Structure formats: C-alpha cells, structure tokens
C-alpha cells in the first residue's frame, strides 16, 4: 500500500535486492571468470522494463561481465515502447555505456531470435547495423537447430545452419559484421555527457502486487528522451546510480564514472529521487564548475524528502541549466559537440557512432528505415575522409571539402543502408594512398548499382513445392472444431491426449 513512508521503504527494499544480486552473484562469478581466464557474458535485460521483477538495475549487472551482453529479438522495428526489442535505443545504450565506463572491449548481442523464416539478408543487415551503431560489436546469431522436425519449425526461427536455403551465401554478411566488429571494438567512444537513468525513481512506484501506472509513465518518458537524443545525433552515456556508487568520483571538474569523465550531467524528466552517493558527487561536481542540466527537479534522497537537496538546487540556480522539454533549443544549447556536426539531416531513422582512434576518428552511419533515404552532411575535425567498405574490405577516399581544420561531407543512405568513414588526425592517410578509387570520383551506394544480365534467365523447379497449411479442422472424440490455427490445434490435441500442452514446444526431447 502507498501509506506511511512507502517511497523510502520501496526504495530501500529494491536497493537491497539489487545489491544482494550484485554481491552474491555478479561479483563472485566475475571474480571466478577472472581467475580462470574466461570471459563471462549473457544478458540480464528482459522485455518488461520499467518493471523490476527480473532485476533492479540492468546496467549494474553489466559492470561485472567481462563481455556485457543483451539479446535482440524479432524483426519489428519499434522506437517508441520501452518494452520493444529492435528499435529500443535505451536497451543498447545501457550496454554501451556500461562498457565504456568499465573498459569492456567487446559487447555481445544474441540477435535475430523469433524474426521468422522469411527474414531476408536486408533484414539481417538492417537490425545488425542498428545495434552496432548504438554500441554492440560482437554478434551471436539465434539460433542453430540440429533438426527442425515437428514443433522445432516454430521454435524462434530463423535457423543459422544448412537447414536454411541461404546458408551457403551467409558468409558475405558474416564477413561484413566481422569487419564492423573489428573496427567498432578498436579505439574509444568518448562522450562528454552523462544522462542519469531514473531507475531509483521507478523503484518508488514499483510493486510486485499492485503496480502504480506512474512506473510506466516514467519509463516511457525516459524512453522518449533518449530516443530523441539519439535521433538528434547527440552523443552521451547513460548512468546507473549503482555503478556510480562503486566507480564514481569528481576530478578536474569532471564527473568521473570508471574510465569515463563527463563535463555535463543530465537529470531526465520525471526524476524524483537521487541516491545519497549520487547527490554527494553531483554537489561536488557543480561546486567544481561542472554543468548540471535539469529536465526535472528531484526532491528525494534515498526515498526521503531532502531539504539539503532543495537548498543545493536553489543556491546554485545560476549555475544549473533548466528545461521543461527536450526541444531544439535544449539540444542546441546543452547537447551540441564541436567534435562532430550534422546539418540538413532528412530521414527520421539515422543513427551514428563515433569512435576516437590514436590516429583519427571513425564514424559509422546507418539508416534503419525500410522506405526512406537518409541524407545530410557531417563535419569532423580532420584533413580528409576515407571510406571503409565493410562488405568488400576495400578502402577509398570519400568526397569531401576541407578548410585545413575540419572536413565536411554529404551522405545519402538508402533504406537499410550504412556508411563507414575514417577521418585521419592529420596529413594524408596511408588508407587513401593505397585505395583503389580516385579521390572525388562518384561513389556508388548500396541499392544504386545496376547489374546487367549475362544472358537469358531461366528458373527451373527442382522439386514440388510444399503447401503450408496454417489452418485446419480438428476432430477429437467425434467433436469437430473448424478453422483452427495449427499451433492451437496441436495444443488442444496434446491437452486431450496427455493433459499437458505440446511437449515439443520450448522443450528438449531425446527420442
């Protein structure tokens, strides 16, 4: 019930559960893998966030993996729901941010599960590009059945074995993601902005027995917030208060979380609570000249009203930026970065990742739309641009303008298209000198290459086609039900004969 000191009680309860999960499971297993020279991986996030019943803080758990990981199911792009899979910006940004802060080189995704038998190479590329742009750099394809007899046919296909007709051609796509995995695990993603997750505020409203609708309202508001930032090409990391507790400090006017130091800290909409350790560091950060950006004014510390927090925010009002909405003005004032500039962007599904190498900057652009082209221009501090073709492994100069300090380039990405660029720090790069294309030549883009036929095309049927029956009539003990979906009919039959559902569904049979 929401009575008495209920916010503090819920906060402390979920904080205790989360910390016990870390202390009694994540830390010992991480230490064991360190001793044995193994990389521990796996995914914690499920598909019900901001519900907390499967864990109190996803990012807190990632911090103890040698290779933090997520899964990414299905093939329906949804960039709105906090419980979506493909399209869920927050889920992948949590992974990438934790890896940045802990120094994990590789981030894994179990990808494509449940996408269906009809997924195409274009679908595979589109989903993979999207999650790689947001922070994944190692892929584990789901799934590789040894057999598809019976109910296995609908056990979360596609199937990555010779049982799929495209298997012999899949190497092309695998090589593509292998090259992306290499370049996106080199260098560092160095973001200057830390956006706190409202996890400890959600704790106040989450209940195992009677969830408050405000829980989903906070989660949805945060989902919109990070998705808007991502589509505005802002560069930022997300912050877990549990990770901040263990790895946070203030040094040189920066808010430090592990291996990352941030010049700005952002408190997102609907945030009510800060943990005591987080508040202490924010206070030190602002007093040291750091920039605090508020889209909400928290009033609680550890679930209790805090006059000290209110006084701090009032006394430092002139040093704190406050916004009521994440609009164009807020993005331009508080999220712009001189290290990369986007102009005249058209297309609502453009994503990017920029990584800093010792000798330059790497930029990966993807267009996740299946219908619209994404166009615009981008500027980077460099002397030239080189395109890295992740399909062929080729390197070639990319058309650009230069003023001695920076380069500017136009891009046009077709639906499900991508572009990988490298901007050398200074001088002319060895990549450009050894490239196969001449500088300034017109660059064909994916989807724009015309293939001429080598001769007449003839298609021959090798064997009779299979006619799939999705609906059927079922007769059991003289009683007939008509037009049932075959999956439902199977369950009814198994229930009648054995008193249980289909034992072949989501189960293992050895005979």
State the predicted function of each range.
Residues 1-511:
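Carbohydrate-binding surfaces of carbohydrate-active enzymes
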């Amino acid at each position: 019930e929401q009575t008495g000191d209920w916010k503090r009680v819920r906060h402390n309860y979920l904080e205790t559960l989360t910390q016990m999960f870390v202390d009694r499971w994540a830390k010992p297993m991480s230490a064991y893998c360190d001793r044995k020279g193994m990389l521990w991986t796996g995914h914690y996030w499920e598909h019900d966030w901001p519900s907390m019943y499967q864990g109190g803080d996803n990012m807190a758990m990632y911090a103890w993996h040698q290779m933090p990981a997520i899964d990414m199911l299905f093939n329906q792009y949804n960039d709105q729901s906090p419980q979506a899979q493909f399209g869920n910006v927050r889920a992948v940004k949590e992974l990438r941010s934790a890896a940045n802060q802990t120094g994990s080189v590789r981030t894994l995704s179990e990808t494509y599960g449940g996408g269906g038998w009809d997924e195409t190479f274009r679908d595979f590329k589109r989903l993979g590009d999207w999650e790689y742009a947001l922070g994944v750099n190692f892929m584990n394809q789901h799934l590789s059945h040894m057999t598809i007899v019976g109910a296995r046919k609908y056990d979360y296909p596609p199937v990555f074995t010779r049982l799929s007709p495209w298997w012999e051609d899949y190497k092309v796509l695998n090589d593509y993601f292998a090259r992306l995995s290499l370049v996106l695990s080199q260098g560092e993603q160095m973001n200057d902005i830390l956006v706190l997750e409202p996890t400890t505020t959600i704790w106040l409203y989450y209940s195992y027995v009677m969830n408050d609708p405000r829980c989903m309202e906070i989660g949805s508001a945060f989902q919109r917030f990070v998705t808007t930032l991502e589509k505005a090409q802002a560069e930022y990391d997300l912050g877990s208060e549990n990770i901040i507790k263990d790895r946070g400090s203030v040094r040189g006017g920066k808010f430090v979380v592990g291996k990352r130091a941030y010049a700005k800290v952002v408190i997102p909409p609907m945030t009510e609570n800060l943990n005591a350790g987080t508040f202490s560091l924010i206070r030190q950060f602002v007093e040291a000249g750091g920039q605090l950006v508020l889209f909400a004014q928290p009033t609680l510390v550890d679930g209790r009203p805090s006059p000290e927090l209110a006084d701090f925010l009032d006394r430092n009002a002139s040093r704190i930026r406050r916004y009521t909405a994440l609009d164009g003005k807020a993005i331009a004032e508080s999220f712009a970065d001189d290290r990369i500039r986007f102009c005249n962007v058209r297309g609502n599904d453009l994503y990017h990742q920029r990584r800093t190498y010792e000798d330059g900057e790497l930029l990966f652009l993807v267009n996740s739309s299946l219908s619209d082209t994404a166009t615009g221009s981008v500027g980077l501090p460099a002397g030239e641009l080189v395109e890295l073709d992740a399909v062929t492994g080729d390197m070639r100069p990319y058309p650009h303008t230069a003023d001695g300090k920076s380069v500017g380039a136009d891009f046009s990405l077709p639906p499900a298209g991508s572009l990988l660029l490298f901007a050398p720090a200074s001088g002319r790069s060895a990549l450009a000198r050894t490239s196969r294309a001449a500088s300034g030549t017109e660059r064909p883009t994916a989807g724009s290459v015309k293939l001429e036929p080598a001769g007449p095309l003839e298609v021959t049927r090798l064997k009779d086609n299979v006619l799939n029956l999705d609906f059927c009539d079922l007769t059991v003990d003289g009683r007939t039900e008509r037009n049932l979906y075959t999956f439902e009919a199977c369950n009814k039959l198994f229930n009648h004969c054995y008193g249980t559902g289909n034992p072949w569904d989501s189960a293992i049979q050895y005979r």
